[in-house]
Amino acid sequence: AKGRADLVVNTDNRRIVFEFKYAKNETEAKTKLSEAVEQIKTRDYGNILPKKAELIRIAAVFNADPKVRAFTEFQLV
């Protein structure tokens, strides 16, 4: 099984797929972003029926550092 993305938003002609990762600090956030991107690609998230005209796939990392506590890394896949 390929699994499922963390969040999928469907509109009339668009599907937006999110894969979220949690990082303890900025250094780990960079690594987690790479993991999320790879996971979206290898598991082919978003390519399900019914097909939509546009597929947007986003990898995002939440940095849990107490001084940051925000999504700091994003990438369109």
Residue ranges of predicted features:
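Structural signature of nuclease core domains in nucleic-acid processing machines
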Residues: 1-77
